[in-house]
């Protein structure tokens, strides 16, 4: 964040509404605050927060967070990770830290994935961003935004000077053609 006190940083945005801030504050009890966890209701500030010891059934793991809270889950075996992801709704973002990123990509489905990093798939406007399943449909950023919010229309234009009878039932001419072939 390039600052020792993110609360005073001009570039660090505030939470959009009181309701959204209350929802995010309620997530702070869903695990152990490893870093951050500070908030100010009057300015709708919530510090970047890392949560550990989070139960997979905790509300912070059931909903899309849309705030500066990063729950961290640890696994002993890579198969546990892919099984965990497969049993839930497809996430908008999947962040994996480890040496088996290719395995994660082959065995999971998510809107976007970062291997050994976070958020970069969202801030890079040359990469499509969007969800899958409950986390959304379609993508945006750059050309993807144009394609998502455009409509490609299918058009069939038949000539008016001739109307081929073999297009209509009963398809006798089609049977004749099949016999000849």
Regions found by a protein language model. Give the residues of each.
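Flexible, acidic loop-helix segments that line cofactor/substrate-binding pockets
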Residues: 1-26, 38-45, 62-67, 125-126, ...
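A structural signal for alpha-helix termini and helix-coil/disorder junctions
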Residues: 3-4, 30, 151-155
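Basic phosphate/pyrophosphate-binding loop/patch that engages nucleotide-derived ligands
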Residues: 26-32
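Short secondary-structure junctions
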Residues: 32-38
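Conserved C-terminal structural/oligomerization subdomain of aldehyde/semialdehyde dehydrogenase
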Residues: 45-181
């Amino acid at each position: 964040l390039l600052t020792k006190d993110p609360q005073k940083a001009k570039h660090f945005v505030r939470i959009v509404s009181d309701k959204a801030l209350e929802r995010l504050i309620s997530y702070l009890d869903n695990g152990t605050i490893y870093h951050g966890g500070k908030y100010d209701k009057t300015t709708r500030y919530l510090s970047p927060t890392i949560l550990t010891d989070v139960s997979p059934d905790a509300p912070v793991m059931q909903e899309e967070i849309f705030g500066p809270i990063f729950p961290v889950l640890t696994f002993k075996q890579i198969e546990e990770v892919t099984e965990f992801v497969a049993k839930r709704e497809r996430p908008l973002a999947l962040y994996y830290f480890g040496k088996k990123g290719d395995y994660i990509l082959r065995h999971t489905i998510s809107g976007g994935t970062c291997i050994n990093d976070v958020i970069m798939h969202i801030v890079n406007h040359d990469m499509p961003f969007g969800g899958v399943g409950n986390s959304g449909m379609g993508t945006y950023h750059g050309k993807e935004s144009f394609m998502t919010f455009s409509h490609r229309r299918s058009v069939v234009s038949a000539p008016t000077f001739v109307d081929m009878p073999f297009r209509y039932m009963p398809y006798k001419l089609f049977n004749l053609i099949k016999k000849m072939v």
